UniProtKB/Swiss-Prot annotation:
Name assigned to this protein: Adenosylcobinamide-GDP ribazoletransferase
Pathway the protein takes part in: Cofactor biosynthesis; adenosylcobalamin biosynthesis; adenosylcobalamin from cob(II)yrinate a,c-diamide: step 7/7
InterPro entries: CobS
Taxonomic lineage: Bacteria, Pseudomonadati, Pseudomonadota, Gammaproteobacteria, Pseudomonadales
Keywords: Cell inner membrane, Cell membrane, Cobalamin biosynthesis, Magnesium, Membrane, Transferase, Transmembrane, Transmembrane helix
GO terms for cellular component: plasma membrane
Main location: membrane
Catalytic reaction(s) noted: alpha-ribazole + adenosylcob(III)inamide-GDP = adenosylcob(III)alamin + GMP + H(+); alpha-ribazole 5'-phosphate + adenosylcob(III)inamide-GDP = adenosylcob(III)alamin 5'-phosphate + GMP + H(+)
Enzyme Commission (EC) number: 2.7.8.26
General function of this protein: Joins adenosylcobinamide-GDP and alpha-ribazole to generate adenosylcobalamin (Ado-cobalamin). Also synthesizes adenosylcobalamin 5'-phosphate from adenosylcobinamide-GDP and alpha-ribazole 5'-phosphate.
Top-level EC class: transferase
Protein family (similarity comment): Belongs to the CobS family.
């Protein structure tokens, strides 16, 4: 039980900006085991967003959507948005070359492509949030962060790590591969408790995952921390839009 709690705390510290403080730096093995808790972190983010949405009942939907999106970004510290920005720049600037793409991803500067992609993704999220809130469907909000963070263990389990060294490789090398399929099956299966909306969100998540993974493999031969972050952001966006349509 103590080890499970520590894994959750490691996952929360890594994926969110919640005030989680550990007594010591996690080991690579602990970072690897923490991947089991990524779906739960998504659930917790979703619960916070739902609670915030309910507390803002009566607020105009556009303002409510803007406040919720701001909270959403703050909860993750824009961690995944940073990965999306890096991947967008690298995918265009890399011109199809693996080494050039990886080099651009390491550049901390953001180019115009990154800015445009971030604006478009945030605009789509905002619009979808406003639509869902206007339809009285705030209860569906947890599906987006939940399924997006459930896709991370699936990515690490099925896709080699493309860049040697770093935290990403340590996580990939210490994945609890025997336990992950059960956790993923349970996480994806529980999404069906949301009925047809859950089924739609799950199908969108899996189809987008399959397509993005194929692009990662074709360009890089694997995944990186940036592409994993992009997967989270694009999955959240796609699920929200699908539910709002």
């Amino acid at each position: 039980m103590r080890e499970a709690l520590r894994s959750l705390l490691v996952a929360l510290q890594f994926l969110t900006r919640l005030p989680v403080r550990l007594s010591a730096m996690p080991t690579p093995e602990q970072f690897g085991r923490a991947v089991l808790c990524y779906p739960l972190v998504g659930v917790l983010i979703g619960v916070v967003l739902y609670a915030a949405a309910r507390s803002l009942d009566g607020t105009p939907p556009l303002l409510q959507a803007a406040l919720l999106l701001s909270l959403w970004v703050a909860l993750s510290g824009a961690l995944h948005l940073d990965g999306l920005a890096d991947m967008a720049d690298a995918w265009v600037g890399g011109l199809g070359d693996r080494e050039r793409t990886l080099a651009i991803m390491k550049d901390p500067r953001s180019g115009p492509v990154a800015v445009v992609v971030l604006v478009l993704v945030l605009l789509l999220k905002f619009s979808a949030l406003a639509a869902l809130l206007g339809q009285g469907e705030a209860g569906l909000l947890p599906l987006a962060p939940w399924l997006a963070r459930s896709s991370l263990p699936l990515l690490f389990l099925t896709t080699p790590y493309a860049r040697p060294g770093g935290l990403g490789q340590a996580i990939a090398e210490h994945l609890p591969a025997r336990s992950l399929p059960w956790v993923l099956g349970g996480s994806f299966g529980l999404a069906l408790a949301f009925g047809l909306a859950g089924l739609l969100a799950l199908l969108v998540t899996l189809m987008l995952f399959a397509w993005l993974r194929s692009r990662f493999l074709a360009r890089l031969g694997g995944t990186t921390g940036d592409t994993a972050g992009a997967l989270v952001e694009l999955t959240e966006c796609a699920v929200l839009v699908a539910l709002a349509l």
